[in-house]
Amino acid sequence: MPVSSYKAKQLIVMRRDLKMRKGKIAAQAGHACVEAVLMALAREDRLSDVSLSYNEDGEPVWIVVDDHGDPSPLTDGFRYGVAKVCVYVDSEEALLDIAQQGRDQGFIVSLIRDAGLTEFHGEATYTCLAFEPLRAEDIDPITGGLPLY
């Protein structure tokens, strides 16, 4: 499904300058994506308002409701798919700047700091970030100019 068909997309910003192994990149991106969604649910105390249903094809569909019992924007993301778009920056400073721009807009940003146990010579290192699932028109002003990873 092309990215333009999705109702929401989740941006992952990786630090390319770290030259992480492919498995490390996948793990760090996974941590960031999951944490950003959980943070978005917790922000409005929604963790208790999440339920699992199944569509006509037997596939799982997560339902998140708002204060009025209506599906929230996150439900559209779960129902119609959330495109994962991975872009990159080449420094910690650039990563932290993107994180701050997102926070300044009121977006949930999961900034991942690896403990350094398997890479980075034992030093804790910021590796990536992920935003909560957002509409393109909301996130593109911040990340639209970044190159795809």
Could you describe each region identified by the protein language model?
Residues M1-Y149:
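Positively charged, small/polar-rich N-terminal and surface patches that mediate targeting and assembly
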